């Protein structure tokens, strides 16, 4: 660990007490490329990350990546990668993954996670359709579409086995899609009965559906923290990211981002 980062780790609390202003710190030693903070994300996932009309990557996660890079005195580089391959590229293709990804025990076996927000899923259904599940209990007997690689696949299978079947109800049929938009298209085509999607993204899907889709759930389903994933053992980068989040919370930028993207803060 560089002496500069050791000093940062020791004195970050004092720095925040003295000033709530955002002040950059020296770059962590274990970035893949000196002066560049490389971040993996799947850029099909608004409001977390998506391409705008000028082909720029915009959203919550690019904004967080830029702020962390600024704190490291590095340039952010965003690398578009399939969601199911994101964890595998940490420490090889990029320094971190920031992509609306939940913190789960399975992922933590492969990488270290720093929680940065809290969210859960919403259930999307055809507006006015016969299937309007309010909770996960009402997904029994429903064909549910969702993006491949999400933690909800395991959660739904477990709920189907341990609640639906044990209560004499039909199983949940799970269909995975490469991307969330493909799951939405399947719902519009009536090939599935409902879609499970992270709440902020679900709202955007509904808003863009021209009144054809609606959120049927009445509360968040499977709420979990979202995490910034880095290579196991990269303590320098972990401490630098934690210091960035502490600074952003102290100067109000964190609260503004969380509010802007309809998430919940996490301590």
Q: What annotation goes with each model-predicted range?
A:
Residues 30, 128-135, 233-239:
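Short helix-loop capping/hinge motifs at secondary-structure junctions, enriched
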Residues 40-45, 79-84, 93-104, 119, ...:
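Beta->alpha turn/N-cap motifs
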Residues 43, 118-125, 207-246, 261-267:
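Periplasmic-binding protein-like
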Residues 65-72, 152-176, 206-210:
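Ligand-binding cleft/hinge of the Venus flytrap
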Residues 66, 70, 75-138, 219-220:
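Acidic, polar ligand-binding/catalytic clefts
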